[in-house]
Structures are given as structure tokens and as C-alpha cells.
Amino acid sequence: MTDDDHPQPWTVETWEDGNGRSPFGKWYLKLHEYDQAIVDATIEHVLQPLGMDICETEWGKSLGEGLYELRIRASLNAILNRGISGEEQVSVPGGDKTVLLRIFCTFHGQRIVLLFQGYDKGKDASDKRQQSEIKRARKHLKTWKKEK
């Protein structure tokens, strides 16, 4: 087996503005513990292994101009058992609750994903809220591009 058979996972970083503030970190810390576990599991089991290829699956969507949306609409157990069959599957107590979360990010270089922010689409699925969040993410992306 060669290294090509097991590509290195993508490195995931959280973007901070010039003042050291992280919109993603601020949002993440406000999440319920279960939702934080889902975000962590999605980053580890979906985003890191797939990188940009999330857009070839239900997990990702390109929003244009280098902005991407990581789409989480699954339960913790479903994420943890992704690609696992039968007796090897795990079951976390209470881990069957499905959530609807969005995380905005960009990809840079071969192996870096920058997380800009997120929101709970399950709490407010309105088009107005979604467009507002996308607009804010585009602003963060523009700022990051100027900084790099």
C-alpha cells in the first residue's frame, strides 16, 4: 500500500481577525455540549479526511469565490459510524438526535481549511438568516484574503 492509498488528513484551523477574535470560536462555545460533539466529530470524520471533496457529497456546498459551506444534518451516532458496519459501530447514549448546523470555510494550499463561522440552521432556517450568515462569511473571507 502506498501513501497515495491513505492521503494525509487536511489540517483544520480557525480563523481569527486582526484583534485575535474568532467568530467560529465564539459561536462554538455557545453551542450545547451535544452540538459541540457533533461539530468535533464532523471535523474529524468528514472534513479532515475529505477536504474539498466534501462538495462532491451531501456534506458540502461551494458558495462561490472560495467560500464553502460544511453542511451538518446528522446525529452524533451517524457521524461516528460513517463507513463502519456491523458490530464495530458505536452508540453514544442520546446520540441519535439529528442537528442542522452550517459552518463556513475556505481551503488554502494543499491541506489547510480555515473555519470562519457557523450557525444553527435548525433554530432559524429562514432565507433571510441564511443570506445574512453567508454575507458575514464573505466579509470574513475577504478580510482573510487581505491578511494572507
Predicted regions and their residues:
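Basic, Lys/Arg-enriched alpha-helical interface segments
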Residues: 1-99, 120-148
